Amino acid sequence: MPTYNEITLAKELIRFPSITPIDAGVMKFLAKKLTTIGFKCKILEFKDKNSKPVKNLYARLGNTQPNFMFAGHLDVVPPGNIQDWTIKPFSPTIKKNHLIGRGANDMKSAIASWVVAVNNYVLTNKKINGSISLLITGDEEGVAINGTKKVVDYLKKKKEKIDFCLVGEPTNPNKLGEMIKIGRRGSINAELTIIGTQGHVAYPHRAKNPSTSLIKILNEIKEIKFDKGTKDFQPTNLEVTKININNTADNVIPGLARATFNIRFNNKHTSSSLKNRLNKIFKKITKKDKSNFKVEYRVSGEAFLTKPNKTTYMIQDVIKKITKIKPQLSTTGGTSDARFIRKIAPCLEFGLVGKTMHKVDEAVSISDLKKLTKIYSEILKNYF
């Protein structure tokens, strides 16, 4: 059995320009590496009529319970203007004790650390009292419809039991060891269209200005105090992100007015309860103004919380032991693929420092990368 190194493996993964939904061969490459350790690998390609096909990987070492799964993604965001980078984004380079390259931080390096941790564990332990698995997607940075969500459905169909999942997203704001994610807020995006009657500005009685209703609605929903937050979650928050009347003439009352907004919500609400509350406001105001509305909602995920258990506290203790920092159990930040995995297993998230994710010259500290491998190795040792 070969011995792998996290820096070398991270570099190899970064060299693949796997910009969502392009695979560029990275999933097959990782599967080959895992096969040498003893994993049975299955590359799963999913597609949708409105989206391009995406490759995913499920790999398992062992065939008994408990099954400890690591989840992550090998797709990356586009590098943007390459001229702004000090290196070629997919030519990983070490400078000033940092590994630079697109995906170094989010999240190819964490995957490399996990693979090396498993490799080391297998080399020093002839028998695993259970199974180790990986769920790696190529659709986390995109629309996320042909990725983890469908792999989870596949695992449910195959009756594959997952006892615990560690998601390797970059969870730490500033220093390695600061934060473990034990849940995430839900997210709703909405596009609201108010339908009025177009007309001449000099004859408002012959028209119905939709912007009047839109302004009233936006004012009302922005003033809503949804809740005060909970012990584990921030207060629910609504932000208006776009207002568009799309009227190029100064002497025309528009026929349509649109706005988009996002709600990040805690576990005091569901997407359905929030939509019902908002729809009542839309109906009330448009009825009074004699206008009409239509609204399209897109729910990225529901709020969820993994109640801390002995595995959570074990991982917290391991991180503290290696980093000398006791990590906070948090639910802050955006959505992640944990929102899909939590349907089949308790899960938490811990990875690198997220300062440079999606940025020009995305980078990870070499010291942090090595420490993360130690943390993952200790987690395996303590879990089994």
From Swiss-Prot:
Annotated residues for binding of Zn(2+) 1: H73, D106, E169
Cofactor: Zn(2+); Co(2+)
One GO MF term: cobalt ion binding
Cofactor note: Binds 2 Zn(2+) or Co(2+) ions per subunit.
Parts of the chain that traverse the membrane: none
Keyword Ion transport: no
Key words, A-Z: Amino-acid biosynthesis, Cobalt, Diaminopimelate biosynthesis, Hydrolase, Lysine biosynthesis, Metal-binding, Zinc
EC class of the enzyme, as a word: hydrolase
CDD domains per UniProt: M20_DapE_proteobac
Function: Catalyzes the hydrolysis of N-succinyl-L,L-diaminopimelic acid (SDAP), forming succinate and LL-2,6-diaminopimelate (DAP), an intermediate involved in the bacterial biosynthesis of lysine and meso-diaminopimelic acid, an essential component of bacterial cell walls.
Similarity comment: family membership: Belongs to the peptidase M20A family. DapE subfamily.
Subunit comment: Homodimer.
Protein name (database record): Succinyl-diaminopimelate desuccinylase
Species: Pelagibacter ubique (strain HTCC1062)
